[in-house]
Regions:
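A near-ubiquitous, low-amplitude feature marking generic local secondary-structure context
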Residues: 53-56, 76, 111
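C-terminal accessory module of base-excision DNA glycosylases/AP lyases that mediates lesion recognition
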Residues: 71, 78-158
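Helix-hairpin-helix/helix-loop-helix acidic hairpins
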Residues: 2-62
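Amphipathic alpha-helical interaction surfaces
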Residues: 6-13, 76-79, 99
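Generic hydrophobic, helix-prone segments enriched in Leu/Val/Ile
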Residues: 1-4, 32-40, 85, 100, ...
Length: 158
């Protein structure tokens, strides 16, 4: 069983679909090309391009790799970028972000578990970058956008 907060439950939900997406000879090259393109966009600090490569209206571009999963991959791929860092966006973060006043996040009631628009994801990354800059100035110490994302993840809706 996975430890709490590591992004997967004891059942490893979705892993079979993720493995199948890259094991299937018919879809492998297409899926690898999509993943490579997204990782390249993340590495140069372009969260919108990275996200839009892996999302389609109402579904993921690669079966089993939805936004809650692939934004984690993009986060690590964007390490060290001089551009805007890709940040993790999942239902916990979205719920706490909504509770903090960012009400433009698409949702159904208290359900934030479906895909977000590319413009929403890009705005989210820019918002947390701006908040980090403001916090850095106030505290006179470096605050990073991913620290704010982590605080949102651990927030009251968790």
């Amino acid at each position: 069983m996975a430890r709490p907060g590591l992004g997967t439950d004891g059942g490893q939900r979705g892993n079979r679909q993720r493995i199948a997406a890259f094991a299937d000879p018919d879809g492998r090259e297409r899926n690898l090309a999509l993943l490579r393109a997204a990782l390249e966009a993340a590495a140069v600090g372009d969260p919108r391009a990275a996200y839009s490569t892996l999302i389609r209206p109402g579904r993921a571009a690669i079966r089993g790799l939805g936004p809650a999963f692939f934004t984690k991959v993009l986060y690590f791929a964007s390490e060290g970028t001089s551009g805007t860092r890709c940040l993790i966006l999942d239902a916990r973060v979205a719920g706490n972000l909504y509770a903090a006043g960012w009400t433009s996040l698409p949702h159904r009631g208290n359900n934030f578990t479906y895909n977000w628009f590319t413009t929403t994801y890009g705005a989210y990354c820019e918002l947390l970058q701006r908040w980090a800059g403001e916090a850095t100035q106030k505290r006179n110490t470096a605050i990073w956008p991913d620290e704010i994302e982590r605080a949102l993840f651990e927030g009251p809706a968790a």
